[in-house]
Amino acid sequence: MTKDIMDAVFIKEMAKTTSNLYRLGWDERNGGNITYLLDEKEVVEYLDVKQIIRTIPMDFDGEKLAGKYFLVTGSGKYFKNVEEAPAVNLGVIQVSEDGKAVHLLWGYTDGGLPTSELPAHFMSHIARLSVDPENRVVMHCHATHLLAMTFTHELTEREFTRTLWQMCTECLVVFPEGVGIIPWLVPGTNEIGEATSEKMKENRLIVWPHHGIYGAGKSMDETFGLIETAEKAAEVYTIVMSQGGIKQAITDEQLKALGERFSVEAKAGYLNN
């Protein structure tokens, strides 16, 4: 007999994280989406994986993820409702062997579908797994101050990253590889998925100008914390600029010393010699 999936750690983690993202104002209405790669061992504790509820076609090639299981937020679903009604707002899916569809094993009980950003998520998982086999989470949200920065700050990866590093001491330690930035593109398309996944090969944070941010990590906490750290730096930057601008900041020499202390290396070329 399988256990009650409502007791699964992965369901509780997803419910807690979506609630926090909504509480922070980063996922208004049905904004934002999360995909969580699950191990088959943890899935079979709660579900009979041979019992397919329905099969949902995909418009891109997911063959590299064939057979893998994911917990995915639903299309058009509000993060504020996940904790109260997980089975309506979430789904456990398995990628078909040919990579052209996903099998729904649990959830979306009102007939819902996985997030419309599934192509961007799956492409990002493929990219991250190619460089980090332990990657499990891809998270998208509309972090307020990071979003605002894309209207007022130079949109080059080096300068955007340097500003974030200079705003909070922990930033270099948390994301020494910096942030990636793609052009503005229509969401929910393969094009934006391809652009995001290409950046994901070198970065875990990808800025979508005038839209939001993508983060990737080994766990829900790590991924949330990654975005949270960058967003805090963006908030500090916003406050600093409203107070008259930067008069002093963490220097490049101090950033180098920070990296040495915590055994991280800033992305090559991002610090001045």
From Swiss-Prot:
HAMAP family with a match to the protein in the record: RhaD
Residues bound to Zn(2+): H140, H142, H211
Family the entry assigns: Belongs to the aldolase class II family. RhaD subfamily.
Cofactor: Zn(2+)
Keyword Lipoprotein: no
Pathway this chain belongs to: Carbohydrate degradation; L-rhamnose degradation; glycerone phosphate from L-rhamnose: step 3/3
Keyword line: Cytoplasm, Lyase, Metal-binding, Rhamnose metabolism, Zinc
Catalytic EC class: lyase
Localization per Swiss-Prot or TrEMBL: Cytoplasm
GO BP terms in the entry: pentose catabolic process; rhamnose catabolic process
EC id: 4.1.2.19
GO cellular component, one term: cytosol
Active-site residues, Swiss-Prot/TrEMBL: E117
Cytoplasm listed as a keyword: yes
Identification of the protein by name: Rhamnulose-1-phosphate aldolase
First-listed, main subcellular location of the protein, grouped into a coarse class: cytoplasm
Co-factor remark: Binds 1 zinc ion per subunit.
Function of the molecule: Catalyzes the reversible cleavage of L-rhamnulose-1-phosphate to dihydroxyacetone phosphate (DHAP) and L-lactaldehyde.
Molecular functions (GO terms): metal ion binding; rhamnulose-1-phosphate aldolase activity
Alphabetical list of InterPro entries matching this protein: Aldolase_class_II_sugar_metab, Aldolase_II/adducin_N, Aldolase_II/adducin_N_sf, Rhamnulose-1-P_Aldolase
Reactions it catalyzes: L-rhamnulose 1-phosphate = (S)-lactaldehyde + dihydroxyacetone phosphate
